[in-house]
């Protein structure tokens, strides 16, 4: 999609929104959802379920600028597609939420977090401009210093109450081909939190640079911090896209190596923290995890 075709899509969406009867509840027409909560199909208006806006035209990466280290993408662009587009240039979004089907707009208006957040905060902190469809049908370009600065500051984590993000411009950061992981065990949450404090203060842990940090708690007295660092070389590369499950390696291996792309999606194959809750932990996994991902992604909370 080009800038011109994007503008055409914006105009068509505005027309579709304007054609809705006043007071009609609205929701986005999306093939998948990553909302981890129960909800009614509604909200329901006086004549039935909410109207659905077709936003499929806003799921494209519009531009990657490797010199300025920025990307311009539609709000419905999945992080998988966004990461693939930026990794070609040796760049990635400053925060990449852990599931491939999470969208850029969803992570901004919802709440996205990942293992670079200790350095880079939340996804919205990399946004420099947003194009937002508001409740009164306007499309506004909001930045930190223009006339819509209040909307720019208030939109993150507003869960769709202020409008829908049609496109966003975000900052990117450089990457290296591999990530070197080290898994550190802890016997209590207190000890684990103390270690996180050290990493936040020093940017490293036990002499190892901390480009990525996340934690896994198996029991109250068995916790692990995984500290990752970019690397140009890897003596081996693990593969967790099939039957080998990443979370099991956390307590088994002291260190590991992944390609940067495989690292970004290390949790995506089985979503272990929620799969048993929706009866998918028994599922036979395909080579690339697509069967299970498709099944889970089709479950609408």
Model segments located where?
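Noncatalytic alpha-helical scaffold of FAD-dependent oxidoreductases
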Residues: 1-301
């Amino acid at each position: 999609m080009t800038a011109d075709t994007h503008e055409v899509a914006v105009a068509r969406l505005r027309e579709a929104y304007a054609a809705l009867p006043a007071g009609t509840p609205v929701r986005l027409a999306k093939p998948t959802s990553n909302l981890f909560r129960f909800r009614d199909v509604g909200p329901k208006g006086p004549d039935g379920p909410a109207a659905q806006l077709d936003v499929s035209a806003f799921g494209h990466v519009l531009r990657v600028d490797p010199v300025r280290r920025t990307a311009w993408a539609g709000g419905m662009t999945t992080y998988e597609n966004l990461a693939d587009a930026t990794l070609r240039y040796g760049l990635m979004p400053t925060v990449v939420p852990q599931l491939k089907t999470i969208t850029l707009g969803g992570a901004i208006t919802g709440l996205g977090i990942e293992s670079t957040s200790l350095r880079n905060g939340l996804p919205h902190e990399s946004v420099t401009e947003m194009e937002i469809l508001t409740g009164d049908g306007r499309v506004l370009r909001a930045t930190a210093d223009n006339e819509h600065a209040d909307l720019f500051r208030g939109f993150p984590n507003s869960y769709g109450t202020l409008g829908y993000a049609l496109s966003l411009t975000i900052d990117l950061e450089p990457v290296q081909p591999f990530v070197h992981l080290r898994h550190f065990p802890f016997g209590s949450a207190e000890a684990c939190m103390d270690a996180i404090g050290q990493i936040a203060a020093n940017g490293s842990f036990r002499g190892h640079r901390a480009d990525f940090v996340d934690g896994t708690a198996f029991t109250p007295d068995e916790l692990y911090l995984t500290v990752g660092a970019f690397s140009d070389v890897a003596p081996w590369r693990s593969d967790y896209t099939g039957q080998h499950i990443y979370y099991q390696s956390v307590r088994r291996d002291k260190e590991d190596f992944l390609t940067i792309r495989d690292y970004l999606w290390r949790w995506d194959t089985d979503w272990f923290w929620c799969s048993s809750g929706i009866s998918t932990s028994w599922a036979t996994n395909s080579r690339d995890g697509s069967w299970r991902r498709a099944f889970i992604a089709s479950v609408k909370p």
